[in-house]
Amino acid sequence: MRVTDIISCALLQASIALSTPVEELGAKAVVAKRFPPVPFLPGKASSVPGSRNKTCMLKALGGGKDDSANILSAVKQCNNGGHVVFPKGQQFTIGTALDLTFLNGIDLDIQGTIQFTNDTDYWQANSFKQVFQNATTFFQLGGKDINVYGGGTLDGNGQAWYDLYAKDIYILRPILFGLIGAKNAKISDLKFRYSPQWYTLVANSSQVVFSNIDIFGDSKSKNPAKNTDGWDTYRSDNIIIQNSNINNGDDCVSFKPNSTNILVQNLVCNGSHGISVGSLGQYPGEVDIVENILVRNISMSNASDGARIKVWPGASSALSGDLQGGGGSGAVRNVTYDGMIVKNVDYAIEITQCYGQKNLTLCNQFPSNLTISDITIKNFKGTTSKKYDPRVGYVVCSSPKVCSDISIENIDVKSPSGTNLFTCANAEGIQSQVNCTVEGDKGGHS
């Protein structure tokens, strides 16, 4: 079944009964938002959340004092059917790594601001180590039947990290929001600000919805905020990311290894590296699968890419000291990008099996062990930047044996000079679909 087949997914929210007198504390608990049924999702419907029958109202200590212990206590008290409120107008400080992977039937109603401390030494030593690309997280949130919402802000206090990374690219920079081992979780109506690295990691999770998330964070110094992906999914299934605004400096969304049955829709992305499959095939001996992905109705501005698939070649290569790899195996299959408006992007479409390898002759000698097949990219409109003018796209496979059934249709994208050329190689049938030029020397950027 193709990913574009409509499969209804009823996303029902809990009705919450509040039992504590929260009004006397000068704050108000808010019931979790309801989501309408969502078409297009190629996965299973979410299960019905349970009821909520108790409320824990937090009060910030203030003055930069660590609220972590009080937060942990409230979460434990209101777990299994409760509602934790971070009141509006209060700023909570987290200076201690929190393991919240025990959650069950709980609403985290973040109306105020949660800010993580900028103690880079502490966080490098104590943040939670994840298993992919040296990823770490400030906290781990997991379990089942979880709602996180409220209109508030999570602030990663990233400036100290941007400046430190400029001096040492091997530091471990925490991810702002770590959803680890979650099932039936809904995260909505929140602002994510100034993450040290990726904004969101969704790992080993299923039946998850992100909706109405506003992401923003830039650097106030000469040192840019790098690797600030909006979302990265990893070993996760049945995920929705929708109705959000993202201003960042790396992938708007990235499907990392073993991401399946994912719907991404109605996003406005600015300053990113596109909506990306990968990178994949980075680690020898690992099998990476990304399949059944639908990306639809996207606005992409001032970005390196619109739609992007990036796969490492069969031999080791390096983009930088902290990003190198190649030789892994697996497959990318049944991926559809349908509907994207692009403005000032370097490439509207980029598919490469030579990621990290600028010498394409060497890449062709050691083709990727990871296959790309059944890819549909259609209904794109807009303009590219001057960077690769006169080209607007790049489709370069390492061998026709590992790259097949790529369909590109209804692409109305022009370069500044008015052309619509693609660099093409080793992709059977692509010459009849787009205006191909000779093979270039680009092996993929970070």
Swiss-Prot record:
Q: Which domain of life is it from?
A: Eukaryota
Q: List the disulfide bonds.
A: C252-C269, C397-C403, C424-C436
Q: Which positions are catalytic residues?
A: D250, H273
**Keywords assigned:** Cell wall biogenesis/degradation, Disulfide bond, Glycoprotein, Glycosidase, Hydrolase, Repeat, Secreted, Signal
State the similarity comment.
Answer: Belongs to the glycosyl hydrolase 28 family.
* Described function: Hydrolysis of 1,4-alpha-D-galactosiduronic linkages in pectate and other galacturonans.
Q: What is the name listed in the Swiss-Prot or TrEMBL entry for this protein?
A: Exopolygalacturonase
Its lineage reads: Eukaryota, Fungi, Dikarya, Ascomycota, Pezizomycotina
